């Protein structure tokens, strides 16, 4: 895998707002630019009277004066009155622009900067307080300070006021910074907390919508996801007890993704399936008639004459059982043999799969692995069709399997990549090779050459541009050695449930967290489990906020830490940005080189 190093430099004002002590301290630096170019201040010589009169010759030697310098006689009189240019005569050329002494006076500049600071601080200190009316002139002053001239103008995100973000774990070290960053950028923020008491209220701004709920209790999450557009999950177990890890890091993610999906499905139904997050239904197995059009085929990869003497044969069936389930089952005892279930897709008029990014299958069974095959080509000539395959694994019981189109590889290596626009046939194949027994005693007693696959539905996932769910996980570095495997097991289970949910996701695995200001050091983004250095909480929070609207962050998992000297043999890091300014988005070039759906 190829990682990337970027220089993370948050804006100076942002860093001061979100320092490691999470206080409300605010400071401002006003740079006073002194004017060293004397030619900008022009002091004209004294003009003669209107009636010309001959002047007596002077005995004094004329001294040449540099432009912009003031002779003793002229300076005392002119500066005492006004530092300005005399009105030009009709014959003289236009004079340069005037410059007041107060414009370059350091004391005056300091007073003006202090006034701007006091006005901004007064407005921000009133956030979350009782509302009051604002005079028009006062509102105009505030707009000029905050939008046109103020220090917060570069943090505003267009359309942020129309986006509601649910922050889970808002009182954690990362969550508190995430909430404040979202507020500064104009988002509507909801915070999910387990209990609402004075200590929790003091950790969050008053303008945050606080929702009481528990990720371990699905019934409490329905109201939390209402009206939410995106979710940032910063919660983590408070202990390394197995029950606590499972409840927060595994089931918590599963319960929240399910509640969010149910909410999106309700919206799609209200909008008659016209929601941008609506999936395309390819097949739903709810009756015996839904099995029409599916065809069972058998075949072998090669012929083995010796093994054919002991060939046990193969058989498969696809039926709607008495328990009202569509089950594809059978066995393959033939060496090199396979059985498959195939159907030609029938899409709604005007619909093509190029608008979607993959397939999601809701299936159950005995935990076998299968091969999903897509046939693509012109519908007028099926002989030109090409086959593309992707391997999937199932679990014992029901699960959702997500298969992105980018995971499909051509059967013939010389064929071009898959074009979803040309897909016309879907096939699911079982083959005995590469099968692994299911964990547990029941799995050890199963014959790996038999299979059972129960179908609920097959849908196409919409190709969204942005992520829906951001999960802050961990790399395992910094965790006690005797508890690391247990922690990582729960984290991986939560990540896996998010990937299978069908939501657009971003999984961030930071190194050991540090309490220090963000934006001070370069960051490393990697996908090779090689991260060992720490990272500040502010930097992780900044990545979460930037990933909300970054298309390169969708459906990606990555590790991140502060820059370090790579060990020999793992120097595969690419320098994609350095010394970025406030307007530079370091996340896009860093994530563009990483792989999706990992």
UniProtKB/Swiss-Prot annotation:
GO molecular function: mRNA binding; RNA binding
Presence of keyword DNA-binding: no
Mutant lacking the gene: phenotype: Impaired photoautotrophy. Seedling lethal. High chlorophyll fluorescence phenotype and severely affected photosystem II (PSII) subunits accumulation associated with a drastically decreased synthesis of the reaction center protein D1 due to a reduced translation initiation (ribosomal loading) of the corresponding psbA mRNA. Plants lacking both HCF173 and HCF244 display stronger PSII defects.
InterPro entries, per the entry: Galactose-bd-like_sf, NAD(P)-bd_dom, NAD(P)-bd_dom_sf, NADH-UbQ_OxRdtase-assoc_prot30
Segments of skewed composition (Pro residues): 87-97
Region span, Disordered: 42-106
Coiled coil residues, start to end: none
Biased amino acid composition, Basic and acidic residues: 73-84
GO cellular component labels: chloroplast; chloroplast envelope; chloroplast membrane; chloroplast stroma; chloroplast thylakoid membrane; photosystem II; thylakoid membrane
Transit pept. (range): 1-79
Superkingdom of this protein's organism: Eukaryota
Keywords: Chloroplast, Membrane, Photosynthesis, Photosystem II, Plastid, Thylakoid, Transit peptide
Membrane topology label: Peripheral membrane protein
Any one GO biological process: photosystem II assembly
Compartment(s): Plastid, Chloroplast membrane; Plastid, Chloroplast thylakoid membrane; Plastid, Chloroplast stroma
UniProt entry tagged with the keyword Membrane: yes
PANTHER family to which the protein is assigned, alphabetical: FLAVIN REDUCTASE-RELATED, NAD(P)-BINDING DOMAIN-CONTAINING PROTEIN
Family, as annotated: Belongs to the NmrA-type oxidoreductase family.
Quaternary structure note: Component of a high molecular weight complex containing psbA mRNA, OHP1, OHP2 and HCF244, and PSII core proteins D1/D2, HCF136 and HCF173. Interacts with LPE1.
Function: Auxiliary factor required, together with HCF244, for the biogenesis of photosystem II (PSII), especially for the synthesis of the reaction center proteins (e.g. D1), via the regulation of the corresponding mRNA (e.g. psbA) translation initiation (ribosomal loading) and stabilization.
Protein name stated in the entry: Protein HIGH CHLOROPHYLL FLUORESCENCE PHENOTYPE 173, chloroplastic
Naturally occurring in which organism (per UniProt): Arabidopsis thaliana
